[in-house]
Amino acid sequence: MTTTTNRIAFQGEPGAYSHEACRKARPAMEALPCRTFEDVIDAVRSDQADLAMLPVENSTYGRVADIHHLLPESGLHIIEEAFVRVHISLLAIPGTPLSEVREAMSHTVLLGQCRGFMRRHGILALTGADTAGSAKEVATRGNPSLAALAAPLAGEIYGLERLADGIEDRQNNTTRFLIMSRQPDYSRRSDRMLTSFVFRVRNIPAALYKAMGGFATNGVNMTKLESYMVDGVFTATQFYADVEGHPEDPALQRALDELRYFTSSLDVLGVYPADPLREAQRQAA
């Protein structure tokens, strides 16, 4: 891959968890904030950025809405995954004691992850547009009774004080991100490679059951299989899958060949190494 801008695009304000993921995965690259997921993809396609950082699922709240619809049409390729722990801090105007905070603002998903802390301290929840945007608003208002729930990075960027760290209810809360590029990279090999693809089955009885049979008979582990409607039509279903292995591995090659027989379309989205945290989480489960 030839780098032209040394930028990685993400959705949200500076200080968002996607921004934190960019810093973790590509610390030498400039992070480019974008308003929407579509804008992130367009930034790479239009050469404003080299890579896109997109969240796809959270261990507490499941898959991120709309992402699986965007991936097949993006024209981009998955080259890496990044697991990022969601550490939540209570951020306020510097010098504010915790006892003075009456309300905390954040994205509705993050508010739901800190119910225990909020209840213990009598803090009311206010819904904001996003996590980093809420931190920015708290800094702008300058009201000591108003705080934000966001990543510690947001506090650094907007000059807020961290009154409490690690206030999330679930200490293993993790978001999985995909790093995407204009060009695929099938050259890398390791013991833990992943292949992601989307497919539609042919309109024949038991097509999905038969399509999945090749992975079982060839000993290929499927780590994810999700379905979603296409264009809002109940009868038009597309499937997204992650499997262990490289398409050039004989076992996976045979499984994909069998899958093709029962599908009307099959598109590989990317081949990439598994994040080390994936195995650590599996062993801890």
Task: Give the location of each predicted region.
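Domain-level signature for soluble enzymes in the chorismate/prephenate branch of the shikimate pathway
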Residues: 1-285
